[in-house]
A protein has these predicted regions:
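N-terminal first-folded block
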Residues: 1-24
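Heptad-repeat amphipathic alpha-helical coiled-coil interaction surface used
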Residues: 6-7, 13-14, 40, 63, ...
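Solenoid-repeat scaffolds in large eukaryotic assemblies
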Residues: 25, 32, 78-81
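Amphipathic, heptad-repeat alpha-helical segments
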Residues: 29, 36-37
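Short, solvent-exposed, charged loop/turn and helix-capping segments
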Residues: 38-53
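Amphipathic, charged alpha-helical scaffolds that flank and support histidine-based chemistry
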Residues: 48, 66-82
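Long, amphipathic, charge-rich alpha-helical segments that form helical bundles/coiled-coils
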Residues: 52-66
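Amphipathic, coiled-coil-like alpha-helical segments
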Residues: 78-98
């Protein structure tokens, strides 16, 4: 699932930051951002306008956190993005199980 891969990318970015591997960090964050952009692009505003608007705001926040982590070389924004996307992934899994 995309949410799991997002978490893997953020974990790799954290490891890369600790190792001062700027290229590895950038590659991992770039891939995580691509996942969020694809999720955002898949929103069907005609089918569920309010839900999609809320998810779009969450995705924009996550993208901003990833950008901060990438630019400032810090882990806390990665942790915020990871936590939020994990919660969304859990919600999607629960909804799918119904």
């Amino acid at each position: 699932m995309l949410f799991d891969r997002f978490a893997q990318d953020c974990a790799h970015a954290r490891t890369s930051l600790a190792a001062k591997d700027i290229h590895g960090k950038a590659k991992a964050i770039d891939h995580a951002m691509c996942i969020v952009i694809e999720l955002k692009a898949a929103l069907d505003h005609a089918a569920a306008p309010e839900l999609c608007a809320n998810l779009e705001a969450v995705y924009d926040f996550v993208l901003a956190r990833l950008s901060d982590a990438n630019a400032k070389l810090t882990v806390p924004p990665l942790d915020q993005a990871t936590k939020l996307m994990a919660e969304l992934g859990d919600a999607f899994r629960q909804g799918h199980a119904l």
